[in-house]
């Protein structure tokens, strides 16, 4: 079973590598960085493993420790249980620690190592103790981060030449992203705390660096004296209007270039008038030919029966199943109501797991 699932994983990895290799030139022609392809491949693999369709069964062990031999003697069995209880009590006493007023509280957290961690670090399936020091008086601060703030930092790092990973370029341009804008306290204000305004902008504005051009110093200074709710509303309306105007200008610029730079409408009209005179006779001949062809096609077509109708209910019943096999038929044999199938080169999904095979046989009766 593990060998079959390993083969499935190899097939999926081969497909991923083939797709990434074939689209690499197209991405490079569009100016997309090579790192984006590598991230796409890694995300694809992570989603494949997260689906658990090709989850590998863990190794049973390295074989260095033989399985324990359990005797049928009840006395020896009781003695073994007593030794196990003593060992557990000793472990509990060792791990116990006193907690004082100014002391730190330590906890042992058992993390179950995955198959990948076990293979890399040499630790088989077990509990890995990790000690965490947490001060009872000064807990560690939490730093919440949002997707928009992360994208802003990455975009700033990319503009300053730090060589960050262009994750913003991989987003859908029409996706709406929240962006947090921090306003300093206005001059002469009693409170020195800064305010955070949240606006919604499409990802295309972040990809094309339009937001930094819209948020000018004059705009920020004009809304600093407004309340937080009103300032957010005014800023959102200004950004929406600016983005709409920019998109409208792009549409007009693209429409102007459709006919070409040196095109003349007068010449087109004169040529069209001459062409209309010459093509009147040709249109009449084409209409006659089309009518004759339609009559011939109508005579050859057979009338449809009710059995030929395709309804949505049939397709829903066909694919409403938990187990699916996609393969090629080698041959089919039948003896009365017993059928035998010989399949080849297929993949099947059984109970949420994927399996590949070169040859397979199946029996059915109906």
Curated annotation (Swiss-Prot):
This is Transcription initiation factor IIA subunit 1. The precursor form (48 kDa) is cleaved to give rise to the alpha (30 kDa) and beta (20 kDa) subunits. It is found in: Nucleus. The modification Phosphoserine is found at residues 265, 306. Belongs to the TFIIA subunit 1 family. The keyword Nucleus applies. Residues 146-162 have a biased composition (Low complexity). The keyword Phosphoprotein applies. One of its GO terms (biological process) is transcription initiation at RNA polymerase II promoter. TFIIA is a component of the transcription machinery of RNA polymerase II and plays an important role in transcriptional activation. TFIIA in a complex with TBP mediates transcriptional activity. InterPro entries: TFIIA_asu/bsu, TFIIA_b-brl. Keywords: Nucleus, Phosphoprotein, Transcription, Transcription regulation. Residues 264-317 have a biased composition (Acidic residues). It comes from Drosophila melanogaster (Fruit fly). GO terms for cellular component: nucleus; transcription factor TFIIA complex. PANTHER family: TRANSCRIPTION INITIATION FACTOR IIA SUBUNIT 1 (PTHR12694:SF8). It comes from the Eukaryota. Residues 56-82, 133-162, 257-317 are annotated as: Disordered. The lineage of its organism: Eukaryota, Metazoa, Ecdysozoa, Arthropoda, Hexapoda. Belongs to the TFIID complex which is composed of TATA binding protein (Tbp) and a number of TBP-associated factors (Tafs). TFIIA is a heterodimer of a unprocessed large subunit 1 and a small subunit gamma. It was originally believed to be a heterotrimer of an alpha (p30), a beta (p20) and a gamma subunit (p14). Interacts with Tbp. Taf4 interacts with TFIIA-L when TFIIA-L is in complex with Tbp. The gene is TfIIA-L. GO terms for molecular function: TBP-class protein binding; TFIID-class transcription factor complex binding.
């Amino acid at each position: 079973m593990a060998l079959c699932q390993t083969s499935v994983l190899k097939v999926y990895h081969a497909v991923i590598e083939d797709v990434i290799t074939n689209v690499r030139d197209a991405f490079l022609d569009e100016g997309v960085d090579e790192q984006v392809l590598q991230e796409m491949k890694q995300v694809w693999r992570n989603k494949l493993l997260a689906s658990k369709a090709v989850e590998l069964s863990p190794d049973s062990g390295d074989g260095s420790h033989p399985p324990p031999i359990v005797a049928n003697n009840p006395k020896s069995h009781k003695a073994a249980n007593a030794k196990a209880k003593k060992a557990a009590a000793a472990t509990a006493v060792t791990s116990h620690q006193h907690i004082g007023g100014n002391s730190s509280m330590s906890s042992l957290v058992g993390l179950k190592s995955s198959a990948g961690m076990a293979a890399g670090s040499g630790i088989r399936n077990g509990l890995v103790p990790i000690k965490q020091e947490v001060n009872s008086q000064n807990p560690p601060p939490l730093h919440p981060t949002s997707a928009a703030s992360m994208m802003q930092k990455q975009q700033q790092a990319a503009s300053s030449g730090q060589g960050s990973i262009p994750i913003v370029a991989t987003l859908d341009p029409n996706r709406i992203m929240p962006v947090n804008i921090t306003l300093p306290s206005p001059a002469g204000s009693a409170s020195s705390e800064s305010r955070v305004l949240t606006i919604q902008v499409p990802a295309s504005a972040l990809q094309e660096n339009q937001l930094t051009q819209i948020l000018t110093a004059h705009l920020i200074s004009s809304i600093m004296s407004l309340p937080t709710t009103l300032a957010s509303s005014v800023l959102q309306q200004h950004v929406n209007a600016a983005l709409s105007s920019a998109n409208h200008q792009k549409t007009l610029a693209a429409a102007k270039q459709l006919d070409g730079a040196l095109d003349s409408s007068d010449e087109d009209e004169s040529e069209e008038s001459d062409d209309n005179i010459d093509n009147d006779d040709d249109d009449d001949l084409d209409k006659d030919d089309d009518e004759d062809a339609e009559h011939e096609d109508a005579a050859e077509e057979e009338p449809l029966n009710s059995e030929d109708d395709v309804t949505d209910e049939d397709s829903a019943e066909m694919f409403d199943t938990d187990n699916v096999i996609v393969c090629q038929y080698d041959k089919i044999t039948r003896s009365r109501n017993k059928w035998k199938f010989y399949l080849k080169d297929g993949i099947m999904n059984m109970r949420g797991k994927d399996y590949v095979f070169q040859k397979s046989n199946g029996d059915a009766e109906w």
